[in-house]
Design a protein with these regions (language model features):
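ATP-dependent carboxylate-activation loops
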Residues: 126
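Functionally critical loop-and-helix segments that line ligand-binding/catalytic clefts
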Residues: 26, 79-116, 121, 251-309
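N-terminal Sec-pathway targeting helices
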Residues: 34-57, 64
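Flexible, glycine-rich phosphate/dinucleotide-binding loops
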Residues: 147, 176, 243, 265, ...
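Substrate-binding cleft of extracellular glycoside hydrolase catalytic domains
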Residues: 94-121, 130-219, 227-229
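N-terminal targeting leaders characterized by basic, low-complexity, disordered sequences
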Residues: 1-37
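Membrane-interface motif at the C-terminal end of an N-terminal transmembrane signal
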Residues: 59-77
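Catalytic domains of cell-wall/extracellular-matrix polysaccharide-remodeling enzymes
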Residues: 198-270
Length: 309
């Protein structure tokens, strides 16, 4: 009997405890649970915001890095084509557009001489690729041989600076003539300033009255004189095959400007090149004649590394 009473009392105590717990304890547990859930939601929102900020900054970075390619793509595929009186054969047009597309994040320039008339050039409108790429540098023929001077050089030299182009001057080398006289002709004609491109030696012909060793020796004389005058190694301009066959073993230390008009993605797969003249039939907005168009294999900051201090 007493055992039954004890069981009854224990049951009543447990029942009373359960009633107390049901009234008071769930509220505290629920509040704690709600706080935990709320904290988790806040943490989740914070993580989402962090991910959003990272994604947003990444998109800005990618957009900035690829802005030139985006502008080029839009201009070539969605923008109405700018009118120009000049035309190229379809194959040449496609080749030029493909190269420009590959290097659309690089720096483009032109080279001109007295063959381009003054009245044919609008210096304020020099662009390519349907207006999406500005011409940023220009190479001007200054001298030829021991006494030749380009008749438009002085005017083009001043005008290119006024229009904030990085300007460069080149000497057309005549292998039959004395290299010292040729170097002096260039130095007397061209007064390079800070921000101008290094002097450029244009080599296109081999001599008939000299050996190749004598020819290379003469070139080194010109380069040495001009380098001593400006304190920087001149840039060598020549054709791909000419460089490969006659120059590459002796002039590897000089910045290289290659001309190659073939249907290729690079002017040379072996030589380390800085500039590529990829067409002599370039159609440039602002010029009414076809011109040589070049690409520098780098950005503006790197191009300025090839200018005089």
């Amino acid at each position: 009997m007493f055992l039954g009473i004890n069981h009854y009392l224990d049951f009543q105590k447990q029942k009373a405890f359960n009633s107390f717990a049901a009234e008071f304890m769930p509220k505290k547990a629920t509040q704690k649970r709600r706080k935990t859930i709320a904290k988790k939601r806040i943490d989740a929102r914070k993580k989402l915001w962090v991910l959003f900020v990272i994604l947003f900054l990444s998109l800005i970075g990618i957009g900035f890095y690829m802005k030139d390619q985006v502008i080029f793509y839009y201009a070539m595929h969605f923008k109405g084509k700018e009118k120009h009186s000049l035309r190229n054969p379809k194959t040449e047009e496609e080749r030029i557009n493909r190269i420009v597309s590959i290097y659309s994040d690089k720096v483009f320039g032109i080279d001109i001489s007295h063959y381009q008339r003054k009245e044919d050039i609008n210096w304020k409108k020099l662009t390519i690729a349907n207006g999406s790429i500005d011409i940023r540098f220009i190479l001007l023929r200054a001298t030829m041989g021991k006494d030749g001077k380009d008749q438009h050089f002085d005017e083009y030299w001043k005008t290119s600076q006024k229009n904030e182009l990085i300007r460069g001057a080149y000497h057309f080398y005549r292998p039959k003539e004395d290299p010292v006289q040729q170097a002096n002709n260039f130095l007397e004609t061209v007064k390079l300033e800070s921000g101008d491109m290094r002097p450029v030696l244009d080599i296109e012909k081999i001599p008939r009255n000299k050996s190749l060793d004598e020819f290379r020796s003469d070139l080194k004389v010109w380069l040495k004189i001009v380098e001593e005058a400006y304190g920087e190694k001149p840039i060598i301009y020549t054709y791909y095959y000419f460089y490969r066959d006659y120059l590459q073993d002796d002039f590897k230390d000089y910045p290289l400007w290659l001309a190659n008009y073939n249907d290729v993605d690079v002017p040379s797969d072996k030589a380390e090149w800085r500039f590529w003249q990829f067409t002599e039939k370039g159609i440039v907005n602002g010029i009414n004649t076809k011109v040589d168009v070049n690409v520098f294999n780098g950005n503006m900051w790197q191009l300025k590394g090839l200018t005089l201090d």
